[in-house]
């Protein structure tokens, strides 16, 4: 019996979650981890040498600033410079008019905090306003702790140094000296996806989880944005490279479910698979060299027949369309997104969000001022950091912050008791800190769902052991106060966000599902013919479906944390939503299979068949918001012409009918198990 079998199921699931998160494969993760690790050690060396205070803040700047590629790091560095100017300006404004008057100081700081939190949710550059909000709140602790205005001004001026020198450091490391370019990461990512595709094409492998496929598809889209902004050649041949990304995503996601043992291994099929794998290898070599791939392969009738027999014709045609595309094809002009959210000034949730954050901060400020316990001022920072648009995401951030703070506090306690008494110089300190910072950097560069644990762990550790001390420290009170401050801020935020204007996603989730199914119906209306425009449209919408399904999955996870909802209603909503997501993914792959057979069918028959499916799906999606959707019932008419031309298509479309019938009935009090059907529609 393995050790895992003796552990409770929740513990096993937690360990599996962390294993999945920490072992994430992502181009650029190792360079980002090394840059962050080296940057942390340099910050400690510089701060200790020149006795620069607020070392934890400098480390936080690094963890938020060093990104996965050089362009993104440079962009964030510019934002940090702008944010630093705004932060210090707002602090001096507050101090000038209200240094000795706590009430007036809060009256001035309150609107600044509310404005920053409002803009953080509605503006594209929300990170800047988040940083301003953090400093505006953190700066309120200076006058309360010190009675000397001159010292407070000096500390505030030190904040400029504390914020800007790590920004300069990360620019030197991540942009000038050891840049990790987005274009190189894109080439590596495309080759990795094609390697996985070839493995599934030639061997019978277990399919990867759909969530992983969708996240890697989204990662390619993000890299495409960075490449477009950072590489001139990519901009020149943008249309070809975008088509390449879409094609690779399609091949990778489709072959993930492909099982070569499901088809007869005739000589023609074996030779065709070898030829297809050879063409994919040629595409890999061209991508690795940064060249646009061109193919002279023309499919013969025997190869087309073999491709149709093993359900690879659509993949083959999609690949060849890319190989025959002109690299200098002009790109489609992209619409520039607005800087503000469309409903920024009409949706009251944004202002309520800002008011809730301010209320939580004021409660924490009143508490720690009333009990005269300045060491727990981290509770105010916690209220701003864990403020998220909805209850579920706020709870997620609270768990991450508490978990990171707990790990950081334990490390700080062990470090203070067992290691600090044996240290004599800065070199020994750096050697001891190196593994701690490396662990924090590796966690911080993992998945977005858990990366904040690494940041919080290192910042909490630094606050307790390195903050404003330039020699050995043995004060355990700091560790206690920082941890308690985070716990208090988390509890206050949980109460406020749960009972004061709670923003639940329980109503948004069915609407999100409806939008996703609407995209799927658009896919079904695209003519199933190997025409260039139709294929490109199909691939682009398909990528959008990956993003939509992933967003629905994440929203389900957040709704599961909304404990203010009735437990039975929440469980039923999540069960139905997950069933819709699962069936939607299966419908997408089943519809892919029909493309391989539909080309031989008369064009006049296809719009009627596809329209029948699309209409049923749109009708089902329209009733999700009001919980009036019933499982679609579709019956296909088997015409002699279609049976004579290609009976395989009818079987594939009957499978689509079965998937339609398994969609949950939202009018029923509980989910009923789906039944297997031979011909599709009728239950």
Curated annotation (Swiss-Prot):
<dbReference type="GO" id="GO:1902599">
    <property type="term" value="P:sulfathiazole transmembrane transport"/>
</dbReference>
<keyword id="KW-0046">Antibiotic resistance</keyword>
<dbReference type="GO" id="GO:0015546">
    <property type="term" value="F:sulfathiazole transmembrane transporter activity"/>
</dbReference>
<feature type="transmembrane region" description="Helical">
    <location>
        <begin position="426"/>
        <end position="446"/>
    </location>
</feature>
<dbReference type="GO" id="GO:0016020">
    <property type="term" value="C:membrane"/>
</dbReference>
<comment type="subunit">
    <text>Could be part of a tripartite efflux system composed of MdtN, MdtO and MdtP.</text>
</comment>
<feature type="transmembrane region" description="Helical">
    <location>
        <begin position="75"/>
        <end position="95"/>
    </location>
</feature>
<comment type="function">
    <text>Could be involved in resistance to puromycin, acriflavine and tetraphenylarsonium chloride.</text>
</comment>
<dbReference type="GO" id="GO:0055085">
    <property type="term" value="P:transmembrane transport"/>
</dbReference>
<dbReference type="GO" id="GO:1990351">
    <property type="term" value="C:transporter complex"/>
</dbReference>
<feature type="transmembrane region" description="Helical">
    <location>
        <begin position="483"/>
        <end position="503"/>
    </location>
</feature>
<comment type="similarity">
    <text>Belongs to the MdtO family.</text>
</comment>
<feature type="transmembrane region" description="Helical">
    <location>
        <begin position="43"/>
        <end position="63"/>
    </location>
</feature>
<dbReference type="Pfam" id="PF04632">
    <property type="entry name" value="FUSC"/>
</dbReference>
<feature type="transmembrane region" description="Helical">
    <location>
        <begin position="125"/>
        <end position="145"/>
    </location>
</feature>
<dbReference type="GO" id="GO:0046677">
    <property type="term" value="P:response to antibiotic"/>
</dbReference>
<keyword id="KW-0812">Transmembrane</keyword>
<protein>
    <recommendedName>
        <fullName>Multidrug resistance protein MdtO</fullName>
    </recommendedName>
</protein>
<keyword id="KW-0997">Cell inner membrane</keyword>
<dbReference type="InterPro" id="IPR006726">
    <property type="entry name" value="PHBA_efflux_AaeB/fusaric-R"/>
</dbReference>
<feature type="transmembrane region" description="Helical">
    <location>
        <begin position="158"/>
        <end position="178"/>
    </location>
</feature>
<feature type="transmembrane region" description="Helical">
    <location>
        <begin position="402"/>
        <end position="422"/>
    </location>
</feature>
<keyword id="KW-1003">Cell membrane</keyword>
<keyword id="KW-1133">Transmembrane helix</keyword>
<feature type="transmembrane region" description="Helical">
    <location>
        <begin position="457"/>
        <end position="477"/>
    </location>
</feature>
<keyword id="KW-0813">Transport</keyword>
<dbReference type="GO" id="GO:0005886">
    <property type="term" value="C:plasma membrane"/>
</dbReference>
<feature type="transmembrane region" description="Helical">
    <location>
        <begin position="100"/>
        <end position="120"/>
    </location>
</feature>
<keyword id="KW-0472">Membrane</keyword>
């Amino acid at each position: 019996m393995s050790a895992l079998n003796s552990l409770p199921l929740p513990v096993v699931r937690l360990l599996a979650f962390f294993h999945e998160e920490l072992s994430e494969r992502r181009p650029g993760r190792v360079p980002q981890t090394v840059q962050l690790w080296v940057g942390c050690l340099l910050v400690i060396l510089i701060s200790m040498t020149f006795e620069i205070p607020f070392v934890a803040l400098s480390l936080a700047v690094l963890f938020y600033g060093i990104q996965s590629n050089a362009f993104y790091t440079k962009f964030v560095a510019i934002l940090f410079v702008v944010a630093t100017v705004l932060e210090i300006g707002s602090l001096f404004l507050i101090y000038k008019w209200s240094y000795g008057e706590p009430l007036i100081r809060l009256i001035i700081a309150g609107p600044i905090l509310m404005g920053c939190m409002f803009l953080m949710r509605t503006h594209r550059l929300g990170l800047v306003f988040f940083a301003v909000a953090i400093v505006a709140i953190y700066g309120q602790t200076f006058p309360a702790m010190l009675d000397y205005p001159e010292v407070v001004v000096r500390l505030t001026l030190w904040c400029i140094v504390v914020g800007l020198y790590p920004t300069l450091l990360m620019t030197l490391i991540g942009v000038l000296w050891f840049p990790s370019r987005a274009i190189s990461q894109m080439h590596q990512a495309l080759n990795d996806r094609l390697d996985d595709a070839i493995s599934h094409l030639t061997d019978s492998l277990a399919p990867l989880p759909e969530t992983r496929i969708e996240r890697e598809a989204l990662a390619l889209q993000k890299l495409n944005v960075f490449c477009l902004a950072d590489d001139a050649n990519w901009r020149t041949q943008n249309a070809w490279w975008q088509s390449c990304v879409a094609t690779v995503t399609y091949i990778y996601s489709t072959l993930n479910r492909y099982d070569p043992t499901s088809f007869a291994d005739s000589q023609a099929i074996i030779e065709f698979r070898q030829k297809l794998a050879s063409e994919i290898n040629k595409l890999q070599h061209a991508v690795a060299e940064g060249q646009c791939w061109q193919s002279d392969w023309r499919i013969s009738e025997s190869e087309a027949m073999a491709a149709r027999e093993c359900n690879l014709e659509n993949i083959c045609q999609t690949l060849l369309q890319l190989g025959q595309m002109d690299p200098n094809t002009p790109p489609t002009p992209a619409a520039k997104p607005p800087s503000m959210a469309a409903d920024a000034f009409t949706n009251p949730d944004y202002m309520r969000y800002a008011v809730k954050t301010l209320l939580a901060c004021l409660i924490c400020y009143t508490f720690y001022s009333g009990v005269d316990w300045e060491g727990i001022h981290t509770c105010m920072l916690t209220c701003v950091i864990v403020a998220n648009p909805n209850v579920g995401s706020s709870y997620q951030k609270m768990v991450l912050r508490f978990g990171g703070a707990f790990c950081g506090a334990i490390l700080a306690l062990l470090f203070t008791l067992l290691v600090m008494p044996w240290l004599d110089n800065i070199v020994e300190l750096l050697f001891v800190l190196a593994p701690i910072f490396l662990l924090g950097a590796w966690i911080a560069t993992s998945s977005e769902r858990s990366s904040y644990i690494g940041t919080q762990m290192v910042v909490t550790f630094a606050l307790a052991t390195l903050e404003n001390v330039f020699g050995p420290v043995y004060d355990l009170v700091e560790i206690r106060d920082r941890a308690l401050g985070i716990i208090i801020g988390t509890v206050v935020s949980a109460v406020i966000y749960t009972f004061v204007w709670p923003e639940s996603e329980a109503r948004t989730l069915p609407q999100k599902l409806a939008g996703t199914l609407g995209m799927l119906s658009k896919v079904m209306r695209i003519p199933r013919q190997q025409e260039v425009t139709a294929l490109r449209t199909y691939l682009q919408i398909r990528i959008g479906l990956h993003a939509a399904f992933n967003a629905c999955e994440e929203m389900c996870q957040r709704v599961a944390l909304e404990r203010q909802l009735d437990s039975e209603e929440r469980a039923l909503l999540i069960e139905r939503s997950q069933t819709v997501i699962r069936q939607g993914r299966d419908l997408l792959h089943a519809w892919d299979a029909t493309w391989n057979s539909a080309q031989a069918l008369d064009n006049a028959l296809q719009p009627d068949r596809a329209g029948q499916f699309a209409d049923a799906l749109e009708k089902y999606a329209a009733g999700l918001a009001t919980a009036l959707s019933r499982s679609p019932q579709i019956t296909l008419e088997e015409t002699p012409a279609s049976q004579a031309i290609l009976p395989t298509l009818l079987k594939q479309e009957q499978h689509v009918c079965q998937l339609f019938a398994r969609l949950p009935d939202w009018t029923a009090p509980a989910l009923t198990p789906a039944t297997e059907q031979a011909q599709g529609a009728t239950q």
